[in-house]
Amino acid sequence: MAEADAVPLHYTVTQAQEVPSWDSCEFLDLWFTGMEGARLYAKFLRPRRSEPMPLVLQFHGYPGASRSFAEQASFAGMGMALIAMDCPGQAGYSEDVGGFLGTTVSGHIIAGLDGLPERMYYVRLHQNIRILCRLVRELDGIDTSRVFVNGGSQGGGLGLACAALNPELIDRAAILYPIFERFQARVGPWRGRDRL
């Protein structure tokens, strides 16, 4: 994670191109720079309110992309912000700069297997999620003591890794049928573990 922590934070938050915002909710496009200069995308929605709000980081299943803003609007109705990142090369907007030969539509679990371990697809993806977590700390209006992760399938595995690798940020996790979660890491205790 030290390599990801050394990447300078560059991000933009703009009005979503897909849908207009509502009186009660903002729909935003969040673009940020990840490992190796990758351009990464996440849907960002939040209720229009002045006090700091909790945030859900949501990760999608494999292969796929983040759900539509309309499907996610209920989070704003509950008073929560949501950031749903598109995993690179899996049907969303995030850019895959891995330089791997062959398809980037499937086969991500083995992408980079014949090279250096730190260049494997999922190593880079976990590092990009770490960069996203650093970025979250800078966003206005987010209560960083109430940041949660949510995901199913691949997204469940990413959510577990996100919680384990960012224990000072992630308070709780709602995980469904995780896959790709068995990556070894040296991490400390997760502060939300005793509440599960």
State the predicted function of each range:
Residues H10-S50:
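N-terminal cap/lid segment of alpha/beta-hydrolase-fold proteins
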Residues A42, R46, P52-Y62, L82:
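Short beta-strand element of the alpha/beta-hydrolase
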Residues R67, A73-S74, A81-Q127:
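Cap/lid segment of the alpha/beta-hydrolase catalytic domain
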Residues D86, N150-G152, L176-Y177:
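Alpha/beta-hydrolase-fold catalytic nucleophile elbow
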Residues H108-F148, G152:
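Gly/Ser-rich "nucleophile elbow"/oxyanion-hole loop immediately N-terminal to the catalytic nucleophile
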Residues G151-G159:
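Gly/Ala-rich beta-loop-alpha elbow adjacent to hydrolase catalytic centers
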Residues L158-L196:
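Hydrolase active-site cap/lid region
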